[in-house]
Amino acid sequence: MENKEVCLVCQDFSSGYHYGIPSCNGCKTFFRRTVMKKQKFVCQFDQNCPVDKSIRCACRFCRFEKCLKVGMDKTSLQASRDPIGYTKRNKKTLRHPMNELSGDESNSCTPDRQLSPLRSFENSLNFLAVRERSANELRMSSYLPKRSLKQALCSKPLINDPIFMSKHATVSPRHTFEKLRFITQDDYHYWHERDWFVLTEYAKTFKVFKNMPYHDKTELVCHAAIVIPVLNQVYNSPDYGLDTVVFPDGTYYDRTHEPTRPAGLNRKKYQVLDLVLKPFREMEINFNEFAAFKAITFLNPDADISLESKHAINEERVLITKQLYAYMVQKDGLEKAIYRFGRLILMGTSMSKMACESKEAVWIADFFENIGFTSFAKELIFGDH
């Protein structure tokens, strides 16, 4: 494919020359908005995140750096011209370059209709990745409202509100660090509250969740209150080895015994390291795989919900599971995909057991007043009753 047909930032189809290089509408808009709003981003990893059409939204720092690296010119940007909008694409029948989602699609020019199954799971996983990126932006912000579980679940989804996200979803100065420090009880409280808030907002982005009765919404979110925060904390942790989970503010925990914490919560910490962190690192789970696995974990029909909601959730869950498997086969080849997919899905069983044991530990800790939960946390852990 000639360069003029490909966005130099993400390798998607180019819609024309923008700011000096061929680029797609998405990267053009992202570059313009970043420059015009003078936005500053922070990479959560080593400033070397992949940027292609399957994962271009995952790290805005690395995406903007790539825009500059491939030649996008800030000086050619004029506020009164080149409005953000849709430019009709040149729909030629073209080969796609090898990339993370589409892989080696074809050895020759292939009509769009023949690529529709691949396009289908590409689009679905892209949507999950965008949702996950937005959820993490909210997690990294300083926004944390005080509200009841009912208020949280009945309000509009903030992640789907672009005006809110542009105003509030910026990285809090608190969520950066220069050196690590061992986590305290207050730090645990802080990050659990943040992750539970983001969980309620994440849940509301699912159409199947929106259509459920309130009782079922509550039960599903409460069922996910242990495992989803664990997934967030582990996947977004910078790599300091297989025995350390690091939070965005530089606080961390490892295998060090914490005598002031209940024994059950110490045990949960070791389970997180062994059952989640270690497999994630060994399998080298990428962003798309994580976004899909998190959705599969959240949409759990084993929650105490109505039969109708169980069917609806299971249908959505099976669809995402099939798309994840197809993606992994496309990316890894059949043999490796079967191993990685099987190992990833089996993690769900171990995590469910961990969640049950953790809730028992929390019940005991609350009974003996070992932990001071907020009313919102109590509703989420013990149910909205």
Swiss-Prot record:
Pfam families per the UniProt record, alphabetical: Hormone_recep (PF00104), zf-C4 (PF00105)
Region of interest: Disordered: 81-110
Location of the protein in the cell: Nucleus
Residue ranges, annotated region (AF-2): 373-384
Stretches assigned to the NR LBD domain: 145-384
Annotated zinc fingers (NR C4-type), start-end: 7-27, 43-62
Taxonomy, superkingdom: Eukaryota
Keyword vocabulary terms for this entry: Activator, DNA-binding, Metal-binding, Nucleus, Receptor, Transcription, Transcription regulation, Zinc, Zinc-finger
SUPFAM superfamilies noted in UniProt: Glucocorticoid receptor-like (DNA-binding domain), Nuclear receptor ligand-binding domain
Molecular function in Gene Ontology: nuclear receptor activity; RNA polymerase II cis-regulatory region sequence-specific DNA binding; zinc ion binding
An example Gene Ontology biological process: regulation of transcription by RNA polymerase II
InterPro entries assigned to the protein according to its UniProt record, in alphabetical order: HNF4-like_DBD (IPR049636), NHR-like_dom_sf (IPR035500), Nucl_hrmn_rcpt_lig-bd (IPR000536), Nuclear_hormone_rcpt_NR2 (IPR050274), Znf_hrmn_rcpt (IPR001628), Znf_NHR/GATA (IPR013088)
Knockout consequences: RNAi-mediated knockdown abolishes expression of acdh-1 when diet is supplemented with 5 nM vitamin B12 and high levels (40 mM) of propionate.
GO CC annotation: chromatin; nucleus
Positions of the DNA-binding region: 4-79
Family: Belongs to the nuclear hormone receptor family.
Function: Probable transcription factor that acts in a feed-forward loop with nhr-10 to activate genes, including itself, involved in the vitamin B12-independent breakdown of the short-chain fatty acid propionate. This pathway is triggered in response to a diet low in vitamin B12, when canonical vitamin B12-dependent propionate breakdown cannot function; the resulting accumulation of propionate is probably sensed by nhr-68 and/or nhr-10.
Protein name, per record: Nuclear hormone receptor family member nhr-68
Species for this entry: Caenorhabditis elegans
Lineage of origin: Eukaryota, Metazoa, Ecdysozoa, Nematoda, Chromadorea
Gene: nhr-68
